[in-house]
Design a protein with these regions (language model features):
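Short S/T/G/P-rich N-terminal loop/turn motif that feeds into the first structured element of a domain
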Residues: 1-72, 77, 90-110
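Short, conserved catalytic or adaptor-binding loops enriched in Gly and charged residues
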Residues: 35, 82-86
Length: 110
């Protein structure tokens, strides 16, 4: 798996999806995630709970301009009905890298 460097912009998406919206949410993601690379984006991690009602993405972009271009892409708009119908509540948070903790210094670590 390729990892982002500190020069990249990193975002975390936390999606909370009602059980009856999971299929629509996943259809939207299947249509949209392949577009990331066209805009300097990279899906670093994609995590999901067992029933698909919570999904977390760690995504990075090479520039804010490309992130904005990705968000404005008409292909995303064309499938927006899927995410809307899913009733997913999405939170996108900009994040920054933190220096690694020295081994054994985290609370509770030994």
């Amino acid at each position: 798996m390729e990892h982002a460097t500190s020069a990249r912009l990193t975002f975390v998406l936390i999606a909370r999806v009602p059980p009856d919206g999971v299929a629509g949410f996943q259809a939207y993601e299947a249509a949209v995630l392949p577009l990331l690379g066209e805009f300097g984006g990279l899906l670093e991690r994609r995590l999901r709970n067992a029933d698909g009602t919570i999904e977390v993405h760690i995504v990075s972009f090479d520039s804010d301009r490309n992130f904005q271009r990705f968000r404005a892409d008409p292909r995303r708009a064309a499938v927006a009905h899927l995410i809307e119908a899913s009733a997913a509540r999405n939170e996108v948070v900009a994040m920054t890298d933190v220096a690694e903790w020295p081994r054994g210094t985290l609370p509770g670590a030994s």
